[in-house]
Design a protein with these regions (language model features):
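Acidic, proline/glycine-rich low-complexity intrinsically disordered segments
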Residues: 1-298, 303-309, 314
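Alpha-helical protein-protein interaction modules
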Residues: 157, 193, 212, 222-225, ...
Length: 470
């Protein structure tokens, strides 16, 4: 399969009224080529971006006016040899010329754009989505753009109404646009099952596109179906090998399922793109699996490379890893370095973080003494923290509510809701379910300002002890 980088078209007409073709031309072309088995269209703004996308061919297009009609000139370049493979020109309306170019590039795989009306296509290209739909009520791409524009303008209810109108049209074009509108509709309505169904349909219609695969993988990972998520990430990476997010999320999915060797290999590959974040992610995966010495080593490497990375969070996580590895005095030394870093950055929460550390590690009196050192402007929050520690604040304990919070939490940042949910399960006599939730260790959350955060480790450790988990 050729990976075709499509650059913005260059307007050589001198007529600013045709500037819309600059971006709309590549968008139409990419849509007409999407889903084919021979050409994978990639939108690229520069040759550098095309190289990062592993493009094998580069498409350069300009357009002029000739005898009152538009003429698109194209040049297809081999990305490796920089030799021109094909050149030519096509006359007609923008829509006609781009569609003809799509068929030239992939005679068997190209499919028609979602409107055959050149005026509707022009209105869409200029951003006049409502007018485009009025000119062609079955113009799926225009509906999708109108829905997205409305949602981004802060009108989700109106966007849902537009999606309903579009989906009510039995003759809406095309199946790909319909699936995209179904995805937008489900997202706006917070319909998880609808989102999964839409992503599944998009992966069927455009199997060589990485976006739908990544969307579906994220849903599987959120549902803690890690093996299914990992398989989807691998499929996406087969299409886009240097997709940093896919590599990072794949590493987490592998680690969350306990497959540490494969996770390490994935993060090593990811490290070629984002070395510090890859090391930090590897440290978190080790931490979750109770490999505290390995976790600390990764966090320490990140901190040594760049003390400011993630506002010093790797150093904080190294302290927690060192403590859970069995050396509290050594962990205290690391935490003091982190608190000194925060103080140097004038972070007003430095004192509070120190108090949370003392409480989390079982030293309540020292935690209370630390709170007393907080600046006067933080007195109200510090009193609320004391109330939590005195047992005067309400701690969520409703089983159904905690289940919902846990299920909606990122698996790599679900420590507190997962711990509270496990507590509720134990109280309900569902110890096997609780035991499964305690398999992975919760990560310390840098940047969290939850007054309940300090309860996480004491309660998690108490649960493991009560359930006799080694």
């Amino acid at each position: 399969m050729e990976r075709l980088a499509i650059f913005p078209f260059s307007n050589l007409t001198g007529d600013a009224a045709l500037d819309w073709v600059t971006k709309a031309g590549p968008a139409i072309l990419a849509q007409e080529l999407a889903g084919g088995a021979r050409v994978l269209p990639l939108r690229a703004s520069t040759t550098g971006i095309a190289a990062l996308q592993y493009a094998t061919q580069l498409l350069h297009c300009t357009f002029t006016q000739r005898n009152g009609a538009l003429q698109i000139q194209y040049a297809l370049e081999d990305a490796n040899s920089h030799r021109m493979i094909a050149t030519g020109s096509i006359d007609g309306t923008a829509l006609f010329a781009v569609s003809a170019l799509a068929r030239t590039l992939d005679a068997n795989g190209a499919h028609p754009f979602s409107t055959a009306n050149p005026d509707a296509a022009a209105a869409w290209g200029r951003g006049e989505f409502e007018r485009a739909v009025a000119l062609d009520p079955d113009f799926g791409t225009a509906w999708a753009s109108w829905i997205a524009q409305t949602a981004q303008a802060g009108k989700p209810d109106v966007a849902v109404e537009l999606a309903g109108r579009a989906l009510a049209r039995a003759s809406l074009r095309t199946p790909l646009d319909k699936a995209q509108i179904q995805l937008s509709n489900a997202t706006l309505r917070r319909d998880g099952a609808g989102r999964a169904a839409a992503f599944t349909e998009l992966t069927r219609l455009a199997p060589h596109e990485s976006g739908p695969l990544l969307g579906l993988a994220t849903i599987e990972q959120q549902a803690r179906r890690y093996s299914a998520a990992a398989e989807l990430y691998r499929r996406a990476l087969a299409i886009d090998p240097r997709n940093a997010d896919a590599l990072n999320f794949l590493g987490y999915a592998q680690g969350e399922s306990g497959d540490l060797e494969d996770a390490k290999k994935t993060f090593e590959t990811y490290g070629q793109i984002q070395p510090n974040n890859a090391l930090d992610s590897l440290g978190e995966v080790y931490f979750m699996n109770g490999r505290f010495a390995d976790a600390e080593k990764s966090f320490a490497q990140v901190s040594a490379r760049d003390p400011n990375f993630l506002k010093g969070a790797p150093l904080m996580k190294a302290a927690y890893a060192h403590w859970l590895g069995g050396d509290l005095p050594g962990a205290d030394a690391l935490m003091q370095k982190y608190l000194a870093f925060l103080s140097k950055q004038n972070d007003p929460r430095a004192v509070w973080y120190g108090a949370v550390w003392f409480y989390a590690t079982g030293r309540q009196e020292q935690a209370l003494a630390m709170l007393a050192k907080a600046p006067a402007e933080q007195a109200a929050n510090m009193e609320r923290q004391r109330a939590v520690w005195r047992g005067e604040a309400h701690i969520p304990d409703d089983l159904n509510q905690l289940r919902a919070v846990y299920q909606n939490a990122n698996p790599a940042a679900d420590g507190l809701p997962r711990t509270l949910y496990a507590e509720a399960l134990v109280k309900a006599g569902k110890t096997d379910e609780a035991r499964a939730l305690l398999k992975l260790w919760p990560l310390p959350e840098a940047g969290s300002d939850s007054l309940l955060q300090s309860l996480m480790y004491p309660r998690y450790l108490a649960l493991r002890k009560a359930l006799k988990i080694q």
